[in-house]
């Protein structure tokens, strides 16, 4: 079966049964029509738990390409942490146990919402209750959201947090994310949040719910709630433990630096306490703190396996998707593997891609044809049109985008047959197959559905339905290479 192989990723072109405002359905696509008649094809899942995202959540290019390249499901932080907590994972979590065993007092801080972008309130609650089992005094430092969730939803989340409060668990401070989660070195904001954590802010006489309402009365929404501390809280003390429950790192670094770094230049701290700090995920490579959920090292990716076989490979895309067919598909590895060639085609310089829906598909295609004629063993290519034009919400332009991709596929398929190349064609997620909602409003987001997968290969008569984690092993099988045990089964 061993053949030189093409892996083609048609970004943003998905499957949808309904034809209304389905750019893929309405496009003139003779190459796709030919493939439907002559090649085995199936449907591939690209969203939700099948790619390591929360149930029902739409896929994206970063996660999609990581999953394709790894050949297995890589659970994203939100899902990985939630699954661990549901299975009592904290019982054996050395970073968590180390942090809480060093003090009778544990401070927990995090974004109080279920937005799932930076944190999740369920994680907040799980850690607080686990600390309570160890007979700790737990202080909650609540960061109000209003950005990833409704602008005035804090009272709803506060009620959930208050349900676990008792003599052991107490709400100590509150701050809008504008202050506690700055990421732009505006340390005057961080200072206000820091001072409340240290008990340097005059405590409000109001209860947490009254305080939120008082901010609303001043037309201040959740994101911008002024940092404060509540009565009976005296600030952090030396040798107490602190765990930041946010799993996204960019907006967690500054306040963590202020709390933990002895050498800190953001602002002059009136008080600096020696805390036993732990973070939910890696926030900064220079932070020395224990990490509850370390980053997973992704090894034995498709590109790595091919490289170890001393075969050649070329990764080709235009600017908009270049990182996806290099860094992301290689498991977060920036440096090319041995015998890995990379081709970057410049995306057109237009304000929005509906002005040029063909984008740089022609130039990308020429690069693919050149690599095929050179006999490159594996060619990975991304066509960005379906996604980037789909994001504009322009249905007519999205139809043209699909047609441009179809033209490119026709040229590649023709040469593949001539040169005996195998081919696997799929998408990282959908987009352009659903361009308007039931009220005729433009849809610009990815879809949470399936995508097509076509295979051209010697002796391949049928392929199974699957998910993106089945792609890498399928490509390796076409190439006659044994897939590593870390990869999931192929589609045929």
UniProtKB/Swiss-Prot annotation:
EC number(s) stated in the UniProt entry for this protein: 5.4.2.12
InterPro entries associated with the record: Alkaline_phosphatase_core_sf, BPG-indep_PGM_N, Metalloenzyme, PGAM_B_sf, Pgm_bpd_ind
Matches recorded under CDD domains: iPGM
Pathway(s) the chain acts in: Carbohydrate degradation; glycolysis; pyruvate from D-glyceraldehyde 3-phosphate: step 3/5
Enzyme's top EC category: isomerase
Complex and partners: Monomer.
Gene that specifies this protein: gpmI
Catalytic residues of the enzyme: 61
Keyword Manganese in record: yes
Species per Swiss-Prot/TrEMBL record: Helicobacter acinonychis (strain Sheeba)
Listed name of the protein: 2,3-bisphosphoglycerate-independent phosphoglycerate mutase
GO biological process: glucose catabolic process; glycolytic process
An annotated GO cellular component: cytosol
């Amino acid at each position: 079966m061993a053949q030189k192989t093409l892996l083609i990723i048609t970004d943003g072109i998905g499957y949808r049964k309904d034809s209304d405002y389905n750019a893929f359905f309405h496009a003139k696509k003779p190459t796709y029509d030919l493939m439907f008649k002559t090649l085995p094809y199936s449907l591939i899942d690209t969203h939700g738990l099948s790619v390591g995202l929360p149930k029902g959540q739409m896929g994206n290019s970063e996660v999609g390409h990581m999953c394709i390249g790894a050949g297995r499901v890589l659970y994203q932080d939100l899902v990985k942490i939630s699954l661990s907590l549901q299975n009592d994972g904290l019982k054996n979590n050395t970073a968590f146990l180390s942090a809480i065993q060093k003090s009778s007092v544990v401070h927990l801080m995090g974004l109080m919402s279920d937005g799932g972008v930076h944190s999740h309130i369920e994680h907040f609650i799980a850690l607080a209750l686990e600390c309570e089992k160890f007979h700790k005094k737990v202080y909650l430092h609540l960061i109000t959201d209003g950005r990833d969730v409704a602008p005035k939803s804090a009272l709803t989340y506060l009620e959930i947090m208050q349900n676990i409060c008792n003599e052991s668990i107490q709400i100590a401070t509150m701050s809008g994310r504008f202050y506690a989660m700055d990421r732009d070195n505006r340390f005057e904001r961080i200072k206000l949040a820091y001072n409340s954590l240290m008990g340097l802010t005059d405590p409000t006489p109001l209860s947490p719910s009254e305080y939120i309402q008082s901010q609303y009365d001043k037309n201040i929404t959740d994101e911008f709630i002024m940092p404060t501390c509540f009565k009976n809280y005296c600030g952090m003390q030396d040798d107490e433990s602190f765990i930041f429950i946010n799993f996204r790192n960019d907006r967690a670094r500054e306040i963590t630096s202020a709390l933990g770094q002895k050498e800190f230049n953001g602002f002059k701290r009136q008080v600096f306490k020696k805390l036993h700090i732990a973070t939910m995920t890696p926030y900064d490579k220079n932070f020395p703190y224990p990490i509850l959920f370390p980053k997973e090292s992704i090894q034995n990716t498709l590109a790595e396996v091919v490289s170890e076989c001393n075969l050649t490979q070329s990764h080709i895309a235009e600017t908009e998707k270049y990182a996806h067919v290099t860094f992301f598909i290689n498991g977060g590895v920036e440096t090319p593997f041995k015998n890995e060639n990379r081709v970057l085609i410049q995306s057109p310089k237009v304000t929005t891609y509906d002005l040029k829906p063909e984008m740089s598909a022609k130039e990308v295609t020429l690069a693919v044809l050149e690599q095929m004629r050179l006999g490159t063993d594996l060619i990975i290519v991304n066509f960005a049109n379906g996604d980037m034009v789909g994001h504009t919400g322009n249905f007519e332009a999205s139809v043209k985008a699909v047609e441009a991709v179809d033209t490119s596929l026709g040229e590649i398929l023709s040469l593949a047959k001539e040169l005996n190349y195998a081919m696997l064609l799929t998408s990282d997620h959908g987009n352009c197959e659903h361009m308007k909602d039931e009220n005729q409003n433009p849809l610009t987001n990815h879809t949470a559905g399936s995508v097509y997968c076509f295979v051209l290969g010697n002796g391949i008569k049928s392929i199974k339905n699957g998910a993106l984690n089945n792609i890498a092993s399928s490509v390796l099988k076409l190439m006659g290479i044994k897939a590593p045990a870390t990869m999931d089964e192929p589609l045929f």
